[in-house]
Regions:
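TRNA-binding/sensing appendages of the translation machinery
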Residues: 1-82, 138
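Short, solvent-exposed helix-helix connector turns and helix-capping sites enriched
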Residues: 162, 190-191, 220
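Hydrophobic mid-domain F-helix/FG-region of cytochrome P450s
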Residues: 143-150, 164-174
Length: 329
């Protein structure tokens, strides 16, 4: 008899579980070596508390909601950054920064599972609280690359962008306020066909529309930062400063990705994603969220990242198959 499980979820059997355990222990070892203490938060949070994060991005993953016996509205956490922001404000109100936390936890998102998106995700990551840019961002990228190296992943690259870049360009060419959210939503999905359509609908002059379509498609070394217009100056300077602080073995993993827009609405500056040729989707990502802690009563700059353990496992298996077939990086 077949007893189904909800779409977007899966069982993990012993052989795969052993492999995933090796991955998570490798990640934990690097996090611990860099001074990140592991925390765990409830899977259930009060909706009213997490609403302080003011996540209004149209591409924000939807959450599961339910009522408890007293009628209070609860949500299943969709990531760990917002719960850790709550922890910092409530449990570490006077602790001097920087504060370093890591985690291994399940998160839940009320997505349309028929699109292949998981409803339950196992994530590992860090949050660095109280360390401003560019130094804090460089530390997070360093820990990220060393953690991936520890798992044995070889072919990955880290795309580095800035959440303020595209909004600054839109403001610079005076995109109508009512059109900006639609453009950002298309860019977050990497849907350049939809981006081009939305730019046409916004009624921009051809040159300005071409600028907003071409800049997000720039990806590569420092040369892609050249020739950007004045409104992009702050974002470009920030990305350059972060890159200059990286050790050579980390810097060689980083590429500039000017179309990078993370779907979570709290990012304010540098953002990054992990790519690997063995997987057709990002393995993980993160960025700066310098305004989030202030919404919980403790204004501190912050940066962090999360890695999807399932996707990391698939990428490692794909690289192993590639080596077995005689493929090289």
């Amino acid at each position: 008899m077949i007893h189904p499980i909800p779409s977007g979820t899966r069982d993990v059997l012993p052989d795969e579980m052993r492999e995933m355990r090796l991955i998570t222990e490798a990640l934990r070892g690097v996090f611990d070596a860099h001074g990140y203490g592991e925390v765990y938060t409830p899977a259930l949070e009060y909706e009213a508390v997490l609403a302080r994060a003011e996540l209004t991005s149209p591409s924000q993953p939807p959450v599961y909601r339910m009522f408890d016996e007293s009628g209070a509205l609860l949500v299943l956490r969709s990531d760990m950054t917002v719960p850790i922001a709550r922890v910092v404000a409530t449990r570490y109100p006077q602790s001097p920064p920087p504060l370093r936390f890591c985690y291994l936890a399940h998160c839940y998102r009320a997505v349309r599972a028929q699109r292949g998106q998981p409803r339950e995700l196992l994530q590992a990551g860090i949050e660095l609280i109280g360390s401003p840019a560019p130094e804090g961002t460089a530390e997070a990228l360093t820990v990220l690359c060393r953690a991936l190296d520890a798992t044995g992943l070889e072919g990955y690259r880290v795309g580095l962008g800035d959440a303020s870049l595209f909004p600054a360009l839109m403001a610079g060419v005076e995109v109508p306020e009512g059109a900006r959210a639609e453009l950002l939503e298309a860019l977050a999905r990497r849907d350049f066909v939809e981006l081009e359509r939305a730019l046409g609908a916004a009624g921009l002059p051809a040159g300005e529309a071409e600028l907003l379509l071409s800049v997000p498609q720039r990806r590569g070394g420092p040369e892609v930062l050249a020739g950007l217009p004045g409104p992009a100056a702050d974002a470009v300077a920030g990305m350059r400063m972060v890159h200059e602080l990286l050790e050579p073995e980390v810097a060689e993993r980083v590429i500039f990705d000017l179309g990078l827009v993370r779907s979570l609405g709290y990012y304010t500056g540098a953002v990054f994603e992990v790519y690997d040729p063995a997987l057709g989707a990002p393995i993980g990502g993160g960025g700066r969220y310098d305004e989030l802690l202030g919404r919980f009563g403790r204004p501190l700059p912050a940066v962090g990242f999360a890695l999807g353990i399932d996707r990391l496992h698939i990428a490692l298996a794909g690289e192993e198959r590639g080596r077995g077939a005689g493929l090289t990086r």
